[in-house]
């Protein structure tokens, strides 16, 4: 050991280095090229660069430094040594001469890494011997060079090295494909370090080598409830697609055992959670026995997200919530599919060209779906209940009793009367042949009701007969039978109690005639009927359709006019025409009304409806001529100026409307504020500041402003 190599004492203490010296010593003096890749495979843990370096040291020395120390081991006979030398010369020499020694400039393998390889191999000798034997003999040329992976387990303070052929590592763990280049000169420059649980990575390496020859001696690993989550996360990071799919399928089949095992499921990312949730039906998630709620709420949250995905074909729901909104009239939550089936208030009923009744809902712009979900969670305290309530909101069925489509949340809202309607056979002062009375609540009803709205004083559960419904073609993946079954299973969460709302259900529980005024039922003081309340059904229906036409035209005028033009409802009345003529005769200057008054059609609508209630049926329905028409009695310049002003006004209105469409929060802010400010938020803040200032201070400031204005007016030349 004292032949001029004191720095190599530690180097020779390792058995691997002693084996390397025994392999390299017979190669000294041979002129043929040495295949250093094959030499490195014989000694696990060493690179071709280290073998070249050690070979140069042995050539400069002239003799092996292990002769004296290991001569007793070789003194038994010359046969093994000669056999080893013969094998080395035959297998390690490159007879073709194609491979040349490549100089390596960078030292990429640290000494700490080599020390870790040696120590961990001593701890797990059985598995490493199996790996080293197969890596050196069987995987030689077919699977590429062996790659050493340093695994650091900080939680257990363990370090271990694993060896795997490069080609097999790239094909199974695609994460390393971008780091392990196909260039042979860079194979020895790569140092792989993985921070992972040692046992989990050992499981992964065994899975990678499951189809190799060495797997015959090693046991093929199996998934367990205690390790499947860790393996799933690690395999997803290493891009082991086949193993990820196996883990997801295992989680679907054994979720009850997994949630009962002591494992952390918070590390599952959104992508894996979505793939797992897609395998579950909502009934399977509901049946999970998750006492600590480690995973069930997350699955229900993913199901809620899927309900809002318009491109996802949901096997649990026939409709999605992507177009969910609230009607500002009937206050019902509707989608694009349910809005044409669920009735609104009687004033928004229309008839299509085929004679079918259609419902027109108006979207409530102040309603926000995120606030709705948060309020549902605050009310129900569980994402499971939130999902079932939302599922019942977007799905519908048809009742075989009332023949009306209903939302699943309104399952217990089937209105009916406990007694049969009684129609009078004789005409008297209180009734006509076309009307009847329910004795249970004294509610009056038409014999032929064109609205086809269900009305009753009591409610019960809807009855659904599946063979009577023609809805099986709407969603083949989720038939009505499945929806009805899910509705019965979770009725306590889905169904909401019935509320006697005067807007949506005015006929329920009301015994007076005011609750029945739908513009189609009884109106006691109608001008065309008798004073005692006699009703003509045909005239009532005619009046109702005329009113709908007027309302539609009125709504269009509200939306596209500023209020300065003459409305169509004011022309048919002779009193209004006389008033306008008197106004024209008065020598008053024309002043344009402010926009603040023009932008409040609600008050105008109330006043106009009061005026129309007494005169809408006396005079015919006439559409008025607008003021912005060309006036032949005026001069050309006047008409051109008027047209230019009208175009400017119209463009300003279009600009304002586009701004409101772009800033959708404007309507929400206006709805929350009791007072509107034309100047926007700055005007509102100024009003708040002025309201907070004492009255005396405001009076003093106003006096000062008036004095300053008067002085400024005096100093200005006339």
UniProtKB/Swiss-Prot annotation:
All residue ranges annotated as the SANT domain in the record: 21-59
Record domain BTB: where: 147-255
UniProt cross-references to Pfam families, sorted A to Z: BTB_SANBR
Stretches the record annotates as Disordered: 555-622, 690-718
CDD domains registered for this protein in UniProt: SANT (cd00167)
Matching InterPro entries: SANBR-like, SANBR_BTB, SANT/Myb, SKP1/BTB/POZ_sf
GO biological process: isotype switching
Residues in coiled coil: none
Ranges annotated as biased composition (Basic and acidic residues): 604-615
Record note on domains: The BTB domain is important for homodimerization and for its function in negative regulation of class switch recombination.
Main function: Negatively regulates class switch recombination or isotype switching in splenic B-cells.
Subunit architecture: Homodimer. Interacts (via the BTB domain) with HDAC1 and NCOR2.
Name of this chain's protein: SANT and BTB domain regulator of class switch recombination
Source organism (scientific name): Mus musculus
């Amino acid at each position: 050991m004292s032949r001029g190599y004191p720095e190599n004492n530690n180097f020779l203490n390792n058995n691997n280095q002693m084996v390397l010296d025994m392999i390299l010593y017979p190669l000294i003096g041979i002129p043929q090229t040495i295949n250093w890749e094959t030499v490195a495979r014989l000694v696990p843990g060493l690179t071709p660069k280290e073998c070249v370096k050690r070979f140069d040291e042995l050539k400069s020395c002239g003799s092996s430094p292990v002769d004296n120390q290991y001569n007793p081991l070789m003194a038994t006979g010359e046969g093994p040594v000669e056999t080893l030398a013969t094998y080395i010369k035959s297998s390690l020499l490159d007879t073709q001469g194609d491979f040349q020694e490549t100089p390596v400039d960078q030292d990429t393998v640290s000494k700490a890494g080599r020390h870790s390889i040696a120590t961990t191999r001593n701890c797990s000798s059985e598995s490493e011997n199996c790996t080293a034997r197969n890596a050196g003999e069987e995987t030689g040329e077919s699977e590429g060079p062996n790659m050493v992976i340093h695994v650091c387990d900080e939680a257990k303070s363990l370090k271990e090295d694993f060896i795997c052929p490069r080609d097999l590592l790239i094909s199974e763990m695609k994460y390393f494909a971008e780091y392990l280049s196909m260039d042979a000169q860079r194979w020895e420059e790569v140092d792989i370090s993985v921070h992972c649980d040692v046992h989990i990575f050992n499981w992964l390496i065994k899975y990678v080598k499951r189809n190799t020859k060495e797997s015959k001696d090693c046991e093929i690993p199996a998934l367990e409830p205690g390790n499947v989550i860790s393996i799933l996360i690690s395999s997803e990071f290493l891009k082991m697609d086949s193993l990820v799919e196996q883990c997801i399928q295992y989680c679907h089949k054994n979720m009850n055992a997994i949630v009962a095992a002591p494992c952390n499921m918070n590390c599952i990312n959104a992508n894996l959670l979505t793939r797992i949730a897609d395998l579950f039906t909502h009934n399977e998630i509901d049946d999970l026995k998750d006492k600590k709620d480690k995973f069930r709420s997350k699955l229900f949250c993913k199901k809620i997200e899927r309900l809002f995905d318009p491109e996802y074909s949901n096997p649990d729901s026939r409709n999605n919530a992507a177009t969910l909104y609230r009607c500002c009239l009937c206050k019902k939550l509707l989608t694009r599919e349910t809005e044409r089936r669920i009735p609104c208030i009687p004033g928004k009923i229309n008839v299509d060209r085929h004679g079918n009744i259609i419902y027109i809902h108006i979207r409530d712009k102040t309603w926000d779906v995120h606030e709705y979900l948060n309020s549902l969670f605050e009310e129900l305290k569980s994402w499971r209940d939130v999902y079932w309530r939302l599922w019942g909101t977007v799905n519908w069925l048809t009742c075989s009793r009332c023949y009306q489509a209903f939302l699943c949340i309104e399952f217990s809202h089937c209105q009916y009367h406990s007694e049969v309607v009684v129609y009078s056979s004789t005409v008297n002062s209180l009734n006509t042949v076309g009307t009847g009375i329910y004795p249970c609540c004294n509610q009056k009803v038409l014999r032929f009701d064109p609205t086809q709205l269900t009305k009753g004083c009591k409610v019960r559960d809807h009855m659904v007969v599946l063979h009577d419904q023609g809805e099986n073609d709407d969603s083949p993946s989720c038939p009505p039978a499945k929806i009805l079954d899910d509705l019965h299973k979770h009725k306590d969460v889905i169904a909401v109690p019935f509320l006697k709302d005067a807007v949506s259900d005015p006929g329920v529980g009301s015994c007076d005639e005011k609750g029945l005024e739908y513009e189609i039922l009884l109106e006691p003081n109608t001008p065309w009927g008798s004073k005692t309340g006699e009703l003509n059904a045909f005239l009532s229906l005619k009046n109702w359709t005329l009113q709908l036409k007027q309302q539609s035209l009125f709504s269009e005028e509200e939306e596209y006019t500023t209020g300065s033009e003459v409305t169509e409802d004011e022309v048919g009345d002779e009193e209004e025409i006389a008033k306008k003529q008197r106004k024209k005769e008065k020598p008053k200057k024309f002043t344009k009304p402010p926009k603040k008054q023009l932008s409040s059609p609600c008050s105008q609508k109330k006043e106009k409806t009061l005026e129309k209630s007494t005169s809408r049926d006396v005079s015919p329905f006439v559409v008025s001529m607008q003021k912005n028409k060309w006036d032949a009695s005026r001069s050309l310049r006047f008409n051109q100026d008027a047209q230019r002003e009208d175009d400017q006004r119209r463009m300003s209105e279009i600009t304002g409307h586009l701004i409101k469409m772009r800033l959708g929060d404007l309507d929400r802010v206006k709805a929350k504020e009791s007072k509107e400010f034309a100047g926007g938020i700055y005007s509102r803040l100024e009003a708040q500041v002025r309201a907070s200032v004492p009255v005396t201070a405001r009076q003093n400031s106003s006096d000062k402003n008036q004095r300053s204005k008067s002085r400024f007016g005096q100093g200005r030349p006339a």
